[in-house]
Amino acid sequence: VAVKTPHQNVTFESSGTQAHGYLALPESGKGPGVIVIQEWWGLTDHIRDIADRLAAQGFVALAPDLYGGAITHDGEEAGQMMSQLPEERGAELLSGAVDYLLASESVTSTKLGTIGFCMGGGFVLQLAAQQGEKISAAVPFYGVGQGVPNDFSGVRAAVQGHYANFDDLYPVADAKAQEEQIRLESGAEVQYFYYDGKHAFHNDENPAGNYDAQLATLAWQRAVDFLRQKAS
């Protein structure tokens, strides 16, 4: 669902290097901040659209480019690109994005929300574990193993997960075990929703052929309501 909002490509510091991202602003120019974390395909039009849709809901949304401009629509190539991204480098880029947003005059919140899909779902949880009090809401959509921390004790954010019962990349049993691990190790508010769909059911570009409009609409509304409640 394409939404037009004020947006721009931005550059920010990350561990002494230049990083890039896509920034979408609400019409007012100000709002609570949200980090949007890409899938293994790269910083695609779909991820930009997610940022635009969040901006239309009143958020300042930044989607960092974890691949340095590379994009693919081929599953095998995407898997290679994901495996070639060191988790430490991904974490550094996201840490720089957090600092950039929190320092922005456009951001009205003192903490940030974060939402991510596929690979980005794993990095959402890593970001919450590493950044502690800076992240107030973490929303992973069908996160895979990439980027997921071993220890969730640093999580201070409320967590809302969206996972598929028929996910061939991340079994639902693993998601349920992860949900319980986060709850036990962090003491945070954790709620995972499980949908009768497949991996990437929310991606309306449909590169995997698994898009489900009804499930996507339900999950998106839950996520937006949660971010509005926890990240404002």
Model regions: which residues?
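Short beta-strand/loop motif that positions the catalytic acidic residue
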Residues: 155, 161-163
